[in-house]
Amino acid sequence: IKQEIDNASFPPILIPDTIAWENYKAVLNSNRFTTYFFNSLIVTGSATLFALLVGVPAGYGIARMQAHKSTIVILIARITPGLSYLIPLFLLFQWVGMLGTLWPQIIIHLVVTVPIVIWIMIGYFETTPMELEEAAVIDGATRWQVFRHVAFPIAKPGIAVAFILAIIFSWNNFVFGIVLASRGTRTLPVAVYNMISFDQLSWGPLAAAALIVTLPVLLLTVFAQRQIVAGLTDGAVKGG
């Protein structure tokens, strides 16, 4: 919100007299920034959707089968640094000719989002009551029907938490984008980084771009917080 001259003033100016809206206009009027914004939407949305489709049933199956060894595998996948498998996947994507598209980023984001979703859903399904599922089985429901009509509705608060965390981890990911993305498939964190140059650094547009990148996830968390807390509270009361 500061003019460029205010950023270097001494003593520092915390709140300027006039807000520099031109910083935001300069960022939003950039065609490349709009492209990067839609790239982030596609990558984050696809990675989150696929992670939920895989992670929720997987978490339910592991929790109900009490497959503790599988839980250890999920934990190892969760704590493994992304750089350890970035170079092998880069060579694989280069070999199959996928570089220059959004698919490499979507696939490698799944390596991050799927373990998060599975880990959260395992913990949530382990705390949900079994009585309703047992009653459905006695009534003749199949395992899939029990999951779809009984376990899934109860687990909606946990799914909401997994959904938000998957979005946050995918949206803010920087390393995968800067390595796998081409000029036309970069995401917003990479776009903000590319605004830093050796000869000149405009703090106003850079800060405006950083705020625009952070704002969607921040708003999503704020608006969904009440529903998540209310759902978790209801689930705890029913489970007790």
Q: Model-derived features: where do they sit?
A:
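A hydrophobic, multi-pass inner-membrane permease signature
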Residues: 1-240
